[in-house]
Amino acid sequence: MRVLGIDPGLRNMGWGVIDVSGTRLAHVANGICHSDSGDLAHRLLSLHGQLTDVLARFQPDTAAVEHTFVNKDGVATLKLGQARGIALLVPAQAGLAVGEYAPNAVKKTVVGVGHAAKEQIQHMVRLHLPGVHLAGPDAADALAVAICHAHHVQSSGRLEAALARAAR
């Protein structure tokens, strides 16, 4: 299974692709979609195009997006929400199921602590994916989202299999 993780952002949208085979994880690629300053519509269009290119290039089977947090600046929160909309839309347009995870759930899954620092996330991503060269903190966060999604998909698959066996 190939998983695309996305860390939404208006200026820098991180993405990371991993392959999952049983309990084995393998890094495929990671990067950042950038949008320069300018009007919001063109920035969102740029992110849409870049993320569409990532999907076309790496052909993931499923995707996951991190929830955004609400900060004190309402305008910034709304803009971030619009970028998150692009992060949800592009994989959905490609016909993929899209998982969504709270930042604390991602950190808990990858680091073991729900309030981990960015450095801890990067360290654990490197441990889970040996040899990975991170394109930046946003790409590391996106890979962490992909790892979290892989873990949850595997867990739910095991649960469904156990329930099916129990129902026989």
UniProtKB/Swiss-Prot annotation:
Q: What is its EC number?
A: 3.1.21.10
Question: What's the top EC group for this one?
Answer: hydrolase
Keywords of this entry = Cytoplasm, DNA damage, DNA recombination, DNA repair, DNA-binding, Endonuclease, Hydrolase, Magnesium, Metal-binding, Nuclease
The entry's localization annotation reads: Cytoplasm
| Active site, renumbered | 7, 66, 138
Check the record and name the InterPro entries matching this protein: RNaseH-like_sf (IPR012337), RNaseH_sf (IPR036397), X-over_junc_endoDNase_Mg_BS (IPR020563), X-over_junc_endoDNase_RuvC (IPR002176)
Catalytic activity field: Endonucleolytic cleavage at a junction such as a reciprocal single-stranded crossover between two homologous DNA duplexes (Holliday junction)
| Binding, Mg(2+) 1 | 7, 138
List cellular component terms (GO).
cytoplasm; Holliday junction resolvase complex
Question: Which Gene Ontology MF annotations are present?
Answer: crossover junction DNA endonuclease activity; DNA binding; magnesium ion binding
The UniProt record gives the binding positions of Mg(2+) 2 as 66
Q: How is the cofactor bound?
A: Binds 2 Mg(2+) ion per subunit.
Give cofactor(s), names only.
Answer: Mg(2+)
Biological processes per GO annotation: DNA recombination; DNA repair
Show the CDD domains listed in the entry: RuvC (cd16962)
Subunit details: Homodimer which binds Holliday junction (HJ) DNA. The HJ becomes 2-fold symmetrical on binding to RuvC with unstacked arms; it has a different conformation from HJ DNA in complex with RuvA. In the full resolvosome a probable DNA-RuvA(4)-RuvB(12)-RuvC(2) complex forms which resolves the HJ.
Q: Which family does it belong to?
A: Belongs to the RuvC family.
Which NCBIfam families does this UniProt record tie to the protein? Answer: ruvC
Role played: The RuvA-RuvB-RuvC complex processes Holliday junction (HJ) DNA during genetic recombination and DNA repair. Endonuclease that resolves HJ intermediates. Cleaves cruciform DNA by making single-stranded nicks across the HJ at symmetrical positions within the homologous arms, yielding a 5'-phosphate and a 3'-hydroxyl group; requires a central core of homology in the junction. The consensus cleavage sequence is 5'-(A/T)TT(C/G)-3'. Cleavage occurs on the 3'-side of the TT dinucleotide at the point of strand exchange.
Please identify the protein, giving its name as recorded. Answer: Crossover junction endodeoxyribonuclease RuvC
Report which gene this protein is encoded by.
ruvC
